[in-house]
């Protein structure tokens, strides 16, 4: 019995490998597709698309009875997530005279390790009814703690003149559509520019409180109250030219996003 089992195992060891090789030799080869060149691969994520954005934070009429004016403050950009071209513009029109005309074109890029802030660099031109001035600009823009919109900017021009602007606002959602927005803007100058009515130090403040209703995600009318005033040497220039040094005004306008 044992010799018979040993003979069967011996025959299996001799014959089975040859049989397996014969079966493999007769099996047809599986065709292999030629790999797609890496240059033809699609991008795994569409993370380099060009987008556009435009917003008007102020597009409003201002009045206190004797004095009525129109003010705009808007900005927009075009670019990718990492590289953008910003355009900003603001100004005030009173009795057909434009003042505070400030227009900027800036290159924008995220600040490493600062999730909600970008640095911006470019040029600013003061273009209104007064003398034209040109500046180089450098600043940051983004969301500070508790999502407070914060935008400090530093300017320099010929003659070593330096200026700074600090502005910000906060959107407090009372409901899903009702928004209360406090806002402030301050301007500083290192040297006086009498032709433009600007003195040294703190030049002016514009601040207000607006209440808007967001009918859609692109449109929200609002009403509010603002104070705009000049200080120090700028206030002296205002008095000498017969202009008020401070105004309290009611406002009505629209916020726009696109």
Located regions from the model:
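Residues that define the transmembrane beta-barrel architecture of outer-membrane proteins
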Residues: 50-52, 68-72, 99-103, 132-136, ...
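Outer-membrane beta-barrel architecture
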Residues: 73-77, 104-108, 139-141, 167-169, ...
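Residue-level signature of outer-membrane beta-barrel architecture
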Residues: 78-80, 109-111, 142, 154-156, ...
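Repeated loop/turn-to-beta-strand initiation elements of outer-membrane beta-barrel proteins
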Residues: 81-87, 113-119, 146-152, 175-180, ...
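Outer-membrane beta-barrel "beta-signal"
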Residues: 209-214, 244-258
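Transmembrane beta-barrel strands of outer-membrane/channel proteins
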Residues: 58-60, 87-91, 121-125, 152-156, ...
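Detector for outer-membrane/organellar transmembrane beta-barrel domains
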Residues: 133-194
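Outer-membrane beta-barrel initiation region
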Residues: 24-97, 109-110
């Amino acid at each position: 019995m044992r010799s018979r089992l040993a003979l069967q195992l011996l025959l299996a060891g001799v014959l089975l490998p040859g049989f397996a090789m014969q079966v493999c030799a007769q099996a047809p080869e599986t065709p292999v597709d030629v790999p797609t060149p890496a240059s033809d691969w699609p991008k795994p994520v569409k993370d380099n698309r060009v987008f556009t954005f435009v917003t008007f934070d102020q597009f409003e009429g201002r009045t206190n009875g004797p004095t009525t004016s129109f003010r705009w403050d808007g900005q927009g950009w075009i670019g990718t997530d990492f590289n953008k071209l910003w355009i900003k513009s603001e100004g005030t029109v009173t009795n057909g005279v434009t003042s505070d005309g400030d227009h900027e074109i800036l290159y924008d890029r995220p600040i490493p390790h600062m999730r909600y802030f970008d640095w911006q660099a470019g040029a600013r031109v003061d273009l209104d009814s007064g003398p034209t001035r040109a500046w180089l600009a450098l600043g940051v823009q983004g969301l500070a703690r508790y999502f407070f919109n914060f935008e400090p900017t530093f300017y320099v021009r010929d003659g070593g003149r330096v200026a700074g602007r600090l502005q910000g606002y906060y959107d407090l959602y009372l409901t899903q559509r009702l928004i209360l927005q406090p806002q402030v803007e301050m301007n500083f100058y290192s040297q006086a520019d009498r032709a433009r009515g600007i003195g040294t130090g703190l030049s002016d403040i514009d601040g207000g409180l607006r209440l808007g209703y967001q009918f859609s995600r692109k449109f929200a009318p609002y009403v509010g109250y603002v104070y705009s005033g000049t200080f120090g040497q700028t206030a002296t220039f205002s008095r000498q030219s017969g202009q008020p040094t401070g105004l309290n005004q009611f406002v009505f306008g629209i916020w726009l996003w696109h």
